[in-house]
Regions:
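Conserved C-terminal structural/oligomerization subdomain of aldehyde/semialdehyde dehydrogenase
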Residues: 1-103
């Protein structure tokens, strides 16, 4: 089961690769949080994390105006924000060729 609550662990790592491997090893990926003073490290980390929502230097990773949802076994699609409507749509392409007199 996926823990859903205020659970946090502190671990030390030697390399960023170790951090990413440890974070991405789980089948659940609702949210991830990164705390750093380095913008370079921020970009290197968030681009490799497999999570639906990522907070950087904050625990507030989503607002009502932004899409929210998990990755992997933590969910499918997004809720919130104007882009979320796409997850509720079933897009269909219809190519119709009718003779002129059929109109």
């Amino acid at each position: 089961d996926e823990p859903f609550g205020p659970i946090g662990t502190l671990q030390s790592f030697e390399t960023l690769d170790e951090v990413i491997t440890q974070a991405n090893r789980l089948p659940f990926a609702l949210a991830a949080y990164v705390f750093t003073r380095s913008l370079k490290l921020t970009h290197a980390t968030v681009n490799r994390l497999e999570a639906g929502v990522i907070g950087v230097n904050t625990f507030v990773a989503s607002t009502a105006e932004t899409p929210f949802g998990g990755s992997k076994d933590s969910g499918f699609g997004r809720e919130g924000g104007s882009t979320a409507i796409r997850d509720y749509l079933d897009t269909k392409f219809i190519n119709l060729a009718m003779p002129q007199d059929a109109l």
